[in-house]
Amino acid sequence: MHFEVHGRTDAEAPTILLSSGLGGSSAYWLPQIEALSDHFRIVTYDHRGTGRTGGEVPTEGGISAMADDVLEIVSALNLEKFHFMGHALGGLIGLDIALRQPRLIDRLVLINAWSKADPHSGRCFDVRIELLEKSGVDAFVKAQPLFLYPAAWMSEHQERLARDDAHGVAHFQGKTNVLRRIAALRAFDIDARLGEIGNPVLVVATKDDLLVPYTRSLRLAEGLPQSELCLLDFGAHAVNITEPDLFNTRLLQFLLPADQT
């Protein structure tokens, strides 16, 4: 597993581990690394089958197998406790760890995640799979921003989107890996077990998320006993990228003691 450590290096530094969504890249968290660096040791990683980790996503194990990869990193760094932040699929990994190894996680942050996949999200993934299988990698990558960002934001960031498209095609994780990762997140269902998770959780959702209805986050906030809900009107699925200042402020309010915010 390829992982990187950023931020504080002192022995007393609290650690936060960041897990991205379907794309699996540690680069997803660049807007958060700067905001967190003064306060935390930050661990980012490329999911199995993606980026510098590479390899194949296993055929079995689903989200739990992805969580095991995180636990491998935790073991390598000798972490006894850490905060965990996950976006979408990454949030599912955090929920899995919170169920299996609750003492490891201090505070958990879930961004546009879910306890059970929504039928609308299923339709979106069906469309993306059909694009990949019938139109190829270029079409799949070019469509991806439509599910991530608000239209107004995309209109103002055309050069960035063009760079992201080129990078996404050049470093595509492979059809088999994409399909296995989508299958894993669609099969994930811990809805009946939310009450077992006693960790403090910040649930972040956006009303304009095209991919994951914000009602899935309402369900998380309802079912998780120690949750706080941050529901935003604008920002879409990748709100930590499109609204970084607003997101980072709320994130630090949740993670830091009151006298440090």
Curated annotation (Swiss-Prot):
Domain AB hydrolase-1: 14-119
Source domain of life: Bacteria
Pfam families: Abhydrolase_1 (PF00561)
Keyword Hydrolase recorded: yes
Any GO BP: nitrogen utilization
InterPro entries tied to this protein: AB_hydrolase, AB_hydrolase_1, AB_hydrolase_fold, Pyrimidine_utilisation_RutD
Single GO MF descriptor: hydrolase activity, acting on carbon-nitrogen (but not peptide) bonds, in linear amides
Reactions listed under catalytic activity: carbamate + 2 H(+) = NH4(+) + CO2
EC number of this enzyme: 3.5.1.-
Gene3D superfamilies linked to this entry: alpha/beta hydrolase (3.40.50.1820)
Keywords: Hydrolase
Family per record: Belongs to the AB hydrolase superfamily. Hydrolase RutD family.
Primary role: Involved in pyrimidine catabolism. May facilitate the hydrolysis of carbamate, a reaction that can also occur spontaneously.
Protein name per its UniProtKB record: Putative carbamate hydrolase RutD
